[in-house]
């Protein structure tokens, strides 16, 4: 069975720690997300001019697009402390209370995977976000009492890959919802070029662009591919990042010209050969591929849909015309008529 290549998955890996030195430190150094950056610049400057905590911010979109980096930049530009945690870690109300009561005025608290937060923990977050107050229940049974604790004004930055899983009360408390989009090849090229320069590796424009083309529109993946290509350039090349060494390295790693790996191609091939291009339900695909539904919906499908290889319909997933073309196959006549409508 073909397993997804971890290198081409947008979730963080332990080896990604090497990328921290390559991350932009200021908003002006951040490449891509032009609309989000422009708006954040206004909100940050306004908060600084007023001397107030910036409004609560929610970053949503596919993984690996820079949510954590933007949150860190926000704190740095605001000149405040940055505290980071994640939804699954906050198992009890006391866990969140301990963090909130230690925040200083205007600090930024970043909660990754906020959609996975315990509902009981989420409940105490509401008054904290709205009124900067914390209501804690002390004791049990008839002796239980509620204690209200005043908090310092702070900025909560939430990050999620599944906006639809956020409850409406929580989602509505974020004054600055911001969707992050996949990056263009040109933007990724700038990121790869900057990364190669910071690594001290000479690069040719065609070499960095080849990596950018295969990075699935995701900076995190671009950074991983860059490191692997540099390995090949140092060991099997002359130390320069050229198109030839990039193409050779990525091909050997199983990354095709669109950035698809064996798991992606298996998904497309399954739809074409076993289900005639669809429509087919996600549960059926999950069973056939031995992949969890979440993995298919959060990791595999977003990029395939963004590239126009797969479409989602009320009746299920369908292989699009470009998907058939990528496999080198002709679409069935029944599907061709749908494409032509």
Curated annotation (Swiss-Prot):
Is this entry keyworded DNA repair? Answer: yes
Annotated residues that bind ATP are located at 22-23, 64, 67-69, 130-132, 173, 183, 220
The chemistry this enzyme catalyses reads: ATP + H2O = ADP + phosphate + H(+)
The record's region (Head domain (RuvB-H)) falls at: 257-341
Query: A GO BP term, please?
Result: DNA recombination
A GO MF annotation of the entry reads: ATP hydrolysis activity
Which InterPro entries does the record associate with it? AAA+_ATPase, AAA_lid_4, DNA_helicase_Holl-junc_RuvB, P-loop_NTPase, RuvB-like_N, RuvB_C, WH-like_DNA-bd_sf, WH_DNA-bd_sf
Per UniProt, what is one Pfam family of this protein? Answer: RuvB_N
Question: Binding of DNA: at which residues?
Answer: 293, 312, 317
Give the keywords, sorted. ATP-binding, Cytoplasm, DNA damage, DNA recombination, DNA repair, DNA-binding, Hydrolase, Nucleotide-binding
- From the Swiss-Prot or TrEMBL record, state where the protein is found: Cytoplasm
- The residues that the entry says bind Mg(2+) are 68
Location of region: Disordered: 1-21
Chain spans, region Small ATPAse domain (RuvB-S):
184-254
- Could you tell me which residues belong to the region Large ATPase domain (RuvB-L)? 4-183
Query: Which E.C. number(s) belong to this protein?
Result: 3.6.4.-
GO cellular component terms attached to this protein's record: cytoplasm; Holliday junction resolvase complex
What's in the domain note? Answer: Has 3 domains, the large (RuvB-L) and small ATPase (RuvB-S) domains and the C-terminal head (RuvB-H) domain. The head domain binds DNA, while the ATPase domains jointly bind ATP, ADP or are empty depending on the state of the subunit in the translocation cycle. During a single DNA translocation step the structure of each domain remains the same, but their relative positions change.
Enumerate the PANTHER family for this protein: HOLLIDAY JUNCTION BRANCH MIGRATION COMPLEX SUBUNIT RUVB (PTHR42848:SF1), PTHR42848
Per the entry, what this protein does is: The RuvA-RuvB-RuvC complex processes Holliday junction (HJ) DNA during genetic recombination and DNA repair, while the RuvA-RuvB complex plays an important role in the rescue of blocked DNA replication forks via replication fork reversal (RFR). RuvA specifically binds to HJ cruciform DNA, conferring on it an open structure. The RuvB hexamer acts as an ATP-dependent pump, pulling dsDNA into and through the RuvAB complex. RuvB forms 2 homohexamers on either side of HJ DNA bound by 1 or 2 RuvA tetramers; 4 subunits per hexamer contact DNA at a time.
User: What family does the Swiss-Prot or TrEMBL record give for this protein?
Assistant: Belongs to the RuvB family.
Q: How does it assemble?
A: Homohexamer. Forms an RuvA(8)-RuvB(12)-Holliday junction (HJ) complex. HJ DNA is sandwiched between 2 RuvA tetramers; dsDNA enters through RuvA and exits via RuvB. An RuvB hexamer assembles on each DNA strand where it exits the tetramer. Each RuvB hexamer is contacted by two RuvA subunits (via domain III) on 2 adjacent RuvB subunits; this complex drives branch migration. In the full resolvosome a probable DNA-RuvA(4)-RuvB(12)-RuvC(2) complex forms which resolves the HJ.
Name of the protein in its database record: Holliday junction branch migration complex subunit RuvB
The protein's organism comes out as Paracoccus denitrificans (strain Pd 1222)
């Amino acid at each position: 069975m073909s397993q997804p290549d971890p290198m081409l998955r947008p979730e963080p890996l332990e080896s990604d720690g090497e990328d921290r030195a390559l991350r932009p430190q200021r908003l002006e150094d951040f490449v891509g997300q032009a609309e989000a950056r422009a708006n954040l610049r206004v909100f940050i400057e306004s908060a600084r001019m007023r001397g107030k905590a910036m409004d609560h911010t929610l970053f949503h979109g596919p993984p690996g697009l820079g949510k954590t980096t933007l949150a860190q930049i926000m704190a740095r530009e605001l000149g405040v402390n940055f505290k980071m945690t994640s939804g699954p870690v906050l198992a009890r109300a006391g866990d969140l209370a301990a963090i909130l009561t230690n925040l200083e005025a205007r600090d930024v608290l970043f909660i990754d995977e906020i959609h996975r937060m315990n509902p009981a923990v989420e409940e105490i977050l509401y008054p904290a976000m709205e009124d900067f107050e914390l209501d804690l229940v002390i004791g049990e049974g008839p002796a239980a009492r509620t204690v209200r604790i005043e908090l310092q004004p702070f900025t909560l930055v939430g990050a999620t890959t599944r906006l639809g899983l956020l409850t409406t009360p929580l989602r509505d408390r974020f004054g600055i919802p911001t969707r992050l989009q996949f990056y263009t090849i040109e933007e990724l090229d700038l990121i790869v070029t900057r990364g190669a320069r910071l690594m001290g590796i000479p690069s040719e424009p065609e070499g960095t662009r080849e990596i950018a083309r295969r990075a699935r529109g995701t900076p995190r993946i671009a950074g991983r591919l860059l490191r692997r290509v540099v390995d090949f350039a140092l060991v099997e090349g002359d130390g320069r990042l050229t198109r030839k060494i990039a193409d050779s390295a990525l091909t050997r790693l199983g990354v095709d010209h669109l950035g698809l790996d064996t798991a992606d191609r298996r998904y497309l091939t399954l739809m074409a050969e076993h289900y005639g291009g669809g429509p087919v339900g996600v549960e059926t695909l999950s069973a056939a591929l031995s992949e969890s539904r979440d993995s298919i919906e959060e990791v595999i499908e977003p990029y395939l849909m963004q590239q126009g290889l797969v479409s989602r319909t009320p009746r299920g997933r369908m292989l699009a015309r470009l998907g058939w073309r990528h496999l080198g196959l002709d679409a069935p006549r029944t599907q061709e008529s749908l494409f032509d409508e």
